[in-house]
């Protein structure tokens, strides 16, 4: 019978490997000019590099501090990406205000309560609610479009993957902070990596949607979306 440790090692290696794939697809398909796809690929590349730290022999204190810093940055980074990828001026404004605000709150909270995982209990819970709300918000806005272009479908797949990942984080968060002792750290990480194995193939399929090119903005679009002139929302045929 295969032990849990072996299963964990296999799952973690596969998950970390998948984190590199979106960036490889962006480079192979020359999607660098497609801003949302590039930013999400960069995000998962950062996740891949961040998860490699697990294979380093760090002291428990150093690993705890690293986990705190990672949790402080993760959701603000994702919200910042949404501020560039969304076509809604309201979502753009909201995420551009909330992302730095959450980071500032996390820093102040850690300065007061200490740089340890326990100090992020309530801040992290609030961040998870906000990022899940923004993801659902964006999915609803995309589905309201009369015609779903290929790139919009690609972004919907990415959003669905993110929603699943952060939904799993909520479960881990509840067990970690409110049901201590119910599961081990290894169990939580195993669930985390398993969620990545499910979510990342969905997200990666979004990068393979046909017709991803930076679209020229029509005069009508420029009038209707004056706030989105500087950075293209998404890419289409």
Can you name each region flagged by the protein language model?
Residues 1-237:
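Terminal, non-globular segments
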């Amino acid at each position: 019978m295969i032990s849990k440790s072996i299963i964990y090692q296999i799952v973690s290696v596969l998950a970390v490997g998948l984190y590199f794939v979106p960036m490889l697809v962006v480079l192979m398909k020359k999607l660098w000019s497609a801003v949302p796809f590039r930013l999400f690929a960069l995000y998962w590349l950062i996740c891949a590099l961040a998860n490699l730290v697990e294979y380093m022999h760090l002291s428990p204190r150093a690993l705890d501090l690293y986990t705190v810093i990672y949790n402080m940055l993760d959701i603000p980074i994702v919200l910042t990406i949404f501020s560039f990828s969304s076509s809604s001026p309201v979502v753009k404004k909201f995420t551009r205000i909330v992302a730095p605000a959450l980071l500032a709150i996390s820093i102040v909270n850690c300065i007061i309560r200490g740089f340890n995982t326990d100090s992020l209990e309530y801040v992290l819970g609030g961040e998870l609610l906000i990022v899940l709300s923004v993801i659902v918000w964006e999915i609803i806005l995309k589905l309201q479009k009369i015609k779903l272009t290929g790139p919009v479908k690609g972004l919907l797949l990415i959003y669905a993957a993110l929603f699943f990942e952060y939904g799993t984080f909520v479960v881990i968060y509840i067990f970690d902070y409110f049901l201590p002792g119910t599961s081990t750290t290894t169990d939580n990480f195993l669930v985390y990596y398993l969620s990545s194995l499910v979510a990342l193939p969905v997200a990666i399929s979004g990068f393979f949607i046909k017709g991803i090119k930076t679209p020229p903005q029509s005069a009508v679009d420029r009038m209707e979306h004056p706030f989105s002139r500087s950075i293209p929302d998404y890419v289409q045929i």
